[in-house]
C-alpha cells in the first residue's frame, strides 16, 4: 500500500454547510473517438473544522479516514481568494 497522502486542488462552489464545503475539481479527458479534450468535473464534500473558506476560493485538500457518509477529505490550505470588487 502506498504511504503517499492524496492531495487535490479545486474551487469551492458552496460553503453553506456547517464545518463543510463542496469543491469542484476539473480534469480534462480525451474523447475516445473524436480526440477532443473534454472538461469533466468531480464534486467532493470536504471537512472544514474552523469554517475558514468562502465560495470561490481555490483550496488544497487531502484524503482522510471517512468523517461521514459523504466526507473523506479534509481542508489543508487556501491557495487563492477571489478578488473583491
From Swiss-Prot:
CDD domains (alphabetical): Ribosomal_uS17
Keyword field contains Protease: no
Domain of life: Bacteria
Keywords tagged on the record: Ribonucleoprotein, Ribosomal protein, RNA-binding, rRNA-binding
GO CC field: cytosolic small ribosomal subunit
PANTHER family with a match to the protein in the record: 40S RIBOSOMAL PROTEIN S11 FAMILY MEMBER, SMALL RIBOSOMAL SUBUNIT PROTEIN US17M
Family indicated by similarity: Belongs to the universal ribosomal protein uS17 family.
Protein name: Small ribosomal subunit protein uS17
Gene giving rise to this polypeptide: rpsQ
